Amino acid sequence: MSTHLLEQLIDAFRILPGVGQKTAQRMAYHMLEREREGGQRLADVLSRAIEKIGHCTECRDFSETKICAICANSSRDRHQLCVVESPPDRLAIEQATGYRGLYFILQGRLSPLDGIGPHELGLDHLGQRLAAGEVTELIIATNATVEGETTAHYLALLARQHGIRPSRLAQGLPLGGELEYLDRGTLSHAFGTRTEVV
């Protein structure tokens, strides 16, 4: 009996964050022994998601349509634009705060050592949105890491170049912390007490 396909399945599970060799083996064996129907459902949904989910042309969030539901919602405040590093960060803010503005998802943060510069984060597109004149406040909600702070500084400079007031989330964000792991109360307080970037 060939185990080549089983090895491929185990390797495929290892692409998930936090999944090492042992966990991948347990997942593969569990699926084959007890969850074949669930595994088929997972394969079908995963295949459709990879085929149909792209990025919103306005905010760069994941979306099945050209413009996501938040950007298409005419009741959102178009004068406020909140910049986050990732879709989970946007979701955390959306669930924990009463924020009703729009978003821009960087899909990362500035990291010259990793070859991630302004172009990779879509900052040329962000600059065009700021130049359009609709945004009056840029809310910078990057993580409190070295790269996040560097990105925040760059974003503040970009906002000022367009005559837009930049603000930064404050109080409650631990240094080195990631937004998606904060509790709702902490994130809501930090969002409500954001300060202007100096």
Curated annotation (Swiss-Prot):
InterPro entries reported for this sequence: DNA_Rcmb_RecR, Rcmb_RecR, Rcmb_RecR_Znf, TOPRIM_dom, TOPRIM_RecR
ZnF C4-type span: 56-71
Pfam families to which the protein is assigned, alphabetical: RecR_C (PF21175), RecR_HhH (PF21176), RecR_ZnF (PF02132), Toprim_4 (PF13662)
Keywords in alphabetical order: DNA damage, DNA recombination, DNA repair, Metal-binding, Zinc, Zinc-finger
GO aspect biological process, one term: DNA recombination
Family from the record: Belongs to the RecR family.
HAMAP family per UniProt: RecR
Protein name, UniProt field: Recombination protein RecR
Naturally occurring in which organism (per UniProt): Xylella fastidiosa (strain Temecula1 / ATCC 700964)
